[in-house]
Amino acid sequence: MSIIVTGAAGFIGSNLLQALNRRGETDIIAVDDLTDGEQFRNLADADIADYLDQNDFLERYARGDFGTVRALFHQGACASTLESNGRYMMENNYRYSCRLLESSLELGVPFLYASSAAVYGAGRTFREARQYERPLNVYGYSKFLFDQRVRRALPQARSQVVGLRYFNVYGPREEHKGRMASVAYHCYQQLRRDGRVELFGEHGGFPPGGHLRDFVAVEDVARVNLHFFDHPQRSGIFNLGSGQARTFNEVALAVINSVRANADQPPLSLQQAVESGLLGYREFPESLRARYQSHTCADLELLREAGYRDDFQSLEEGVAGYCRWLARSA
């Protein structure tokens, strides 16, 4: 009886593989698109039973070729909020997901998929309800529209369907994402390359480096996925963040102080980091002004009601662990 993970060579998918392996699960079918061959690195240390291209997988899954499937973790998508090709985005994120949902419901396979906090757009209420959902870009819209499809399917569903709205996830195995990698990743790379970190300046009433996001460690994201895997009677759409909004300044400072701690140097305050030149700012890009989420913070009420009780890592401990991983991987 297999477990299937789409997007298995991606950031969250590959971390989910690692979490499953730690449980002793190895009968796993990994599904992805390895056109970017370098992403094989995220699979190389995972124990899996098979690999399939995402296009070959779709038809075979619909036919029931894989026998009894314990769960399908659908993590595959185009995750670029800067992608402007709406036709590509809707086919890759929306239509593909719809086909997997339909097949999963017909086969009775638990279906756990990645949604996104991008569905909330520029709003200040991050609750899983239609009135708060106003995406700012076609990526957010593709996730939003599929969530609506799921909401219509849930009342008649005879097997588990779970959507997890990921907030700002950071952690190991994201380097292939380039510009879409986390703030923590880019801060670390800037610091190692240039000896300083540079953040966006003032925008939308927020001071330099003061934009607020809900940053959540990828290890916590994997744990929440496995919580629902362990409780197949629970369905719905749930926020997945830390439940706390932190500034980009705090992320940058956590990275700076983590690197300093690894070099046996004392921590700095934000003011000290700025005055020493380790942290600076640049003008906010004009191209992002109309489609930028300046503030996010997950409302975790529904997730807690669904039985998830574990604490989330603090930003400081999560970033410290991530910086150690990056240093080992250099």
From Swiss-Prot:
Cross-referenced InterPro entries: Epimerase_deHydtase, Heptose_epim, NAD(P)-bd_dom_sf
Q: Its Gene Ontology molecular function terms?
A: ADP-glyceromanno-heptose 6-epimerase activity; NADP binding
> Might you give the EC number(s) for this enzyme?
5.1.3.20
Superkingdom, according to UniProt?
Bacteria
**Pathways per UniProt:** Nucleotide-sugar biosynthesis; ADP-L-glycero-beta-D-manno-heptose biosynthesis; ADP-L-glycero-beta-D-manno-heptose from D-glycero-beta-D-manno-heptose 7-phosphate: step 4/4
Positions bound to NADP(+): 11-12, 32-33, 39, 54, 75-79, 92, 143, 169, 177
Query: What is the required cofactor set for this protein?
Result: NADP(+)
Cofactor binding note: Binds 1 NADP(+) per subunit.
At which positions is substrate bound?
Answer: 168, 179, 186, 200-203, 213, 292
Q: What class of enzyme is it?
A: isomerase
Which keywords accompany this UniProt record? Answer: Carbohydrate metabolism, Isomerase, NADP
Q: Which Gene3D superfamilies does the record cross-reference, listed alphabetically?
A: NAD(P)-binding Rossmann-like Domain, UDP-galactose 4-epimerase, domain 1
Cite the domain annotation text: Contains a large N-terminal NADP-binding domain, and a smaller C-terminal substrate-binding domain.
Function, in words = Catalyzes the interconversion between ADP-D-glycero-beta-D-manno-heptose and ADP-L-glycero-beta-D-manno-heptose via an epimerization at carbon 6 of the heptose.
Q: How does it assemble?
A: Homopentamer.
**Record's NCBIfam families?**
heptose_epim
Similarity field: Belongs to the NAD(P)-dependent epimerase/dehydratase family. HldD subfamily.
Q: Which protein are we looking at?
A: ADP-L-glycero-D-manno-heptose-6-epimerase
Gene that codes for this?
hldD
